[in-house]
């Protein structure tokens, strides 16, 4: 008899263009599926025989959607012939180990020559300068179908493994944290239709998953914040970050029939309102165009229905030829920063990245550099 060690897990992503990606994950991954039940109870007064029936019965109504979550590091790299990759992909083009996950989150359903696409329209494009990930194809009612996540957990002796397949997987959310003491980490979560036992697939794309030179150091992160020229809050603000978070969410809903007499199973999903939001923390600083000035500007503009800032977060800094990640949000709406009175007073500013027009898809663009 062998036991299984969670630290030996491998994650594979398949179901797109006949490719299989291996994605290294961090401790804390999870996946589960529960049953939705109905309880029928009896509650009556005492009868002539002195009996009061108090029984109950349970019914399985349906299977809830599979819920999964895991974390990866943000790991950009330049392609090389030394690793397995898609046909047509070019050496020295910039990619990311977790690139496929961004594509699936933002509507991609094909992989062609190193780029993620929705049909023939690009979701990600890569060249020798950067990897660009856009939201332009994310206005879709459903995400890619047929996606399978396979978690393979070897046993202690190495003589076998358990493989769990999450079928019909759809990515709901990606949340990137940049605590300055750590490495840039992305937390992924989503849902699927069923969990089944399977087998480990054969990897076709595993570029740079064993590299140790493509991690992003959060301490090097910088922030540029500029008010729109149409705003009464004019100028640029220089905030030195102590931490932060950016979250992209599809607000998915899974659909499950409600027929009686059978255990219903989820049949698929629909997307909800797409949202990009986040928070930025920094020390309270009275330097010119610092956090104190931003707080004052926002409190003095409370009469404005909306505000608009051009927000650029450079996770890992701006130095060329180093691993880094940039979020560009050109129409960000900021809330009044909140103070935290610890030993050193700090402020937290929350924001929502919005499209220029309500039906647009330009609320954010993501770029990797290596």
Model-assigned labels for residue ranges:
Residues 1-370:
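Signature of extracytoplasmic/envelope-associated structural regions
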């Amino acid at each position: 008899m062998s036991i299984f060690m969670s630290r030996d897990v491998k994650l594979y992503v398949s179901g797109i263009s006949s490719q299989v990606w291996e994605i290294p994950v961090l401790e804390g991954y999870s996946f589960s599926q529960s049953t939705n039940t109905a309880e029928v109870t009896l509650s009556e007064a005492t009868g002539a025989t002195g009996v009061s029936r108090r029984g109950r019965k349970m019914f399985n109504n349906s299977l809830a959607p599979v819920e999964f979550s895991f974390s990866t590091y943000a790991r950009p790299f330049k392609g090389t012939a030394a690793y397995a990759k898609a046909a047509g992909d070019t050496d020295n083009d910039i990619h990311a180990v977790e690139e496929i996950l961004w594509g699936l989150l933002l509507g991609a359903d094909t992989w062609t020559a190193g780029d993620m696409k929705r049909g023939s329209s690009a979701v990600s494009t890569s060249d020798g300068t950067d990897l660009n990930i856009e939201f332009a194809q994310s206005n879709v009612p459903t995400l890619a179908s047929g996606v399978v996540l396979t978690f393979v957990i070897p046993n202690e002796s190495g003589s076998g493994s358990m493989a769990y397949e999450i079928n019909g997987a759809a990515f709901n959310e990606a949340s990137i944290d940049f605590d300055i003491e750590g490495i840039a980490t992305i937390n992924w979560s989503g849902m699927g239709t069923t969990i089944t036992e399977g087998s480990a697939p054969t990897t076709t794309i595993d570029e740079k998953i064993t590299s140790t030179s493509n991690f992003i150091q959060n301490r090097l992160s910088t922030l540029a914040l500029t008010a729109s020229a149409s705003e009464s809050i004019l100028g640029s603000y220089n905030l030195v970050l102590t931490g932060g978070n950016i979250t992209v969410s599809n607000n998915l809903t899974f659909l499950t029939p409600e027929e009686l007499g059978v255990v219903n199973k989820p049949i698929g999903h629909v997307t909800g309102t797409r949202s990009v939001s986040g928070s930025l923390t920094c020390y309270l600083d009275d330097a010119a165009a610092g956090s104190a000035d931003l707080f004052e500007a926002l409190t003095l503009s409370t009469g404005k229905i909306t505000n608009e800032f051009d927000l650029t977060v450079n996770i890992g800094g701006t130095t060329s030829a180093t691993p880094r990640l940039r979020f560009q949000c050109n129409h960000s709406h900021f809330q009044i920063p909140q103070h935290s009175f610890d030993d050193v007073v700090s402020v937290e500013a929350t924001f929502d990245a919005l499209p220029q027009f309500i039906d647009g898809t330009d609320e954010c663009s993501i770029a990797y550099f290596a």
